[in-house]
Amino acid sequence: MEAHLANETKHALWHNDHTKGLLHVVIPNAGLIAAGIDPALLILKKPGQRFKVEVQTRYHATGQCEPWCQVFAAYIPDNALTNLLIPKTEPFVSHVFSATHNSGGLILSLPVYLSPGLFFDAFNVVAIRINTGNRKHRDICIMYAELIPNGTRYFADGQRVLLLCKQLIAYIRCTPRLASSIKIYAEHMVAAMGESHTSNGDNIGPVSSIIDLDRQLTSGGIDDSPAETRIQENNRDVLELIKRAVNIVNSRHPVRPSSSRVASGLLQSAKGHGAQTSNTDPINNGSFDGVLEPPGQGRFTGKKNNSSASIPPLQDVLLFTPASTEPQSLMEWFDICYAQLVSGDTPADFWKRRPLSIVPRHYAESPSPLIVVSYNGSSAWGGRITGSPILYHSAQAIIDAACINARVDNPQSLHVTARQELVARLPFLANVLNNQTPLPAFKPGAEMFLNQVFKQACVTSLTQGLITELQTNPTLQQLMEYDIADSSQTVIDEIVARTPDLIQTIVSVLTEMSMDAFYNSSLMYAVLAYLSSVYTRPQGGGYIPYLHASFPCWLGNRSIYLFDYYNSGGEILKLSKVPVPVALEKVGIGNSTQLRGKFIRSADIVDIGICSKYLPGQCYAYICLGFNQQLQSILVLPGGFAACFCITDTLQAALPASLIGPILDRFCFSIPNPHK
């Protein structure tokens, strides 16, 4: 919960308007695993070890997106919901509260971009990137429609708060060596609950009901749903607490009868002045500046001569009494009892002792739902700091109504007048309703479409470049500098005989490359290094590749290549988990020129496995494919036999120009224009 508090504090300091909201979420371990993220990498085992979580909002259909921004995040390996819903008591006391076991998860907060009226575009996407330092890349992408619930579930949390009180009372009654004041506070809690407990705690014993956190997620519905407005049997004790709280408030300041009349509103004022005359003591006229009406001449008073009593001095009309400092309600006694037991209190623990809302939300990329959390004192989505929950509204209902009235299936098919009316009400639709959007509009798979187009353009340019080179120069030369021993001649002869099949298989493997394989391939890293070096942002400035593995290629000259390693025997599979940087230097051998390889080592690059022990072509077990910043490519077979080709022209032909900006905005950091 501390991560949620930190993000909310940061949000309150940076944003004082209503154009950017905040959503507190928990991504369980199952959701992290589904995204290809190993939760073990988030466990900080060494001093200085850390992970970084960044988020980005990607706008509907336009390809535009916000810059990546870092958010506070915390990973709880086990019992993440317990961390959010159960107040901490360690290290002072232990085993006070008990709850069922639950999964670990990542706790973070996500920004939500809104238009006036707290409306959001349901097709906006928030991307979550978790950087663990192992260089593997994968974003978690969730649409606003999947992320933002329709309402809160505070009503379903009432039983948890009641059980916390019962568990605290049970612990205090069963623990003899506690301060007498704590035991007195516990008995006040019992009295406030209105239950008749015996002195030895027959009804509240050491084995009280355990809080079922799984039931918290599944029982009950949205607070405002008609089904939940009916009072159910298991919630009657909560309602009874509310009634008793009202009685306590009334007992604190009871209505006292008085012989003098006290005005309480215009109607009561009229009744009070009905039997009075205007023959009164002098009254300070300054007291009437503002909204008060002259005595005896109000809109609801009688005539001046219809009564004989005098009007009491104006200063006696309002009566102020000092507020009682002694706790009265169950929650107040709960607070003071808890703080005394654990020797203090924190904002996080205070929020845990008040009703919470936890709403599971399913999204396409994971079979396990994430959890949206709202706090009673929060200003983020669902928070009740202003009294009622702060809710954001989807604009899709307004758009659907316009389409139904116009009898069209696609909002982009609306008449110009209807589109202008929508834009006037929802300004963020100005670019979306344009038929020339680079990404599909009103389609949930727009982000996947962009990634698929990017991957397909890269793979197509690579395979076409390789095939063209082999058709032009079918004989492979030994371009890498290696001395082949006589004992290895048999292996070389076998490789030569298998070369056509190997190349055909490599082309098939590249063509059928999955998105996960593409995300961690030297092909994508090199293409991003090339695009970020030659393209600038429309508003000025440039790009830096996000992934550190691209830096040797992006910063280096044409001699720095990023290589992927494939096995040369049996079924050809990609072996290297991350690209291997190698510097290729030209050397003269007699009348010919060959390439000499050297590994590029970096302190921030983790061990890249056995592939880093052999340079391209040095081991008969590997086929290597590499690219430099200018997309000059080289396919190296065992023994150093290689084919060189360039894919720059084919990439520019295969990748639509309108998608280059959106691709770089997603996979690179933006550099602002230094002249602005």
UniProtKB/Swiss-Prot annotation:
Residues 275-287 have a biased composition (Polar residues). Residues 253-308 are annotated as: Disordered. It comes from the Viruses. It is found in: Virion; Host nucleus. Its main location: virion. The keyword Aminoacyl-tRNA synthetase does not apply. One of its GO terms (biological process) is chromosome organization. Pfam families: Herpes_UL17 (PF04559). Keywords: Capsid protein, Host nucleus, Late protein, Viral genome packaging, Viral release from host cell, Virion. Residues 253-264 have a biased composition (Low complexity). One of its GO terms (cellular component) is viral capsid. The keyword Protein transport does not apply. Interacts (via C-terminus) with capsid vertex component 2/CVC2. Capsid vertex-specific component that plays a role during viral DNA encapsidation, assuring correct genome cleavage and presumably stabilizing capsids that contain full-length viral genomes. Belongs to the herpesviridae CVC1 protein family. This is Capsid vertex component 1. It comes from Varicella-zoster virus (strain Dumas). The lineage of its organism: Viruses, Duplodnaviria, Heunggongvirae, Peploviricota, Herviviricetes.
